[in-house]
Amino acid sequence: ERAADLARRAASVSHDGGAVHAAQLLAAMESQAFVERDVQRLLDVGLAQIPRRSIIRRLAADIRAWHARYDDWHACYGEIAAHYGYDKYTGNCHVVPNHALILMALLYGGDSFQRALTIVNTAPSFRF
């Protein structure tokens, strides 16, 4: 809770809405990762810190469902592009598609942070 609160305070200086919620979710996950290795449980911890009606919560639920449906992250990436692609959000670097890639990479990376980094850094080359 403290990590999410600090992230909210810091993010609120220059952002609002989904960007703040994304920061809270990741901060909570990161702080809990010192004692928990299961990504699904870490995601639950992060989601508990953001509002139920947040776009980030909806995005996380969709990515979890696609992760359960598809063994290959490329298929999940296609769903992200169709539902949360950069063409659907304005700005140079919108948090929604970027956060989707982070969550996808963490879920498909499993217990390998190296694999997660490979996925998240490879995915953008498959352009939305």
Specify the residue positions occupied by each region the protein language model found:
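Accessory "access/gating" subregions that flank catalytic or transport cores
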Residues: 1, 8-13, 27-124
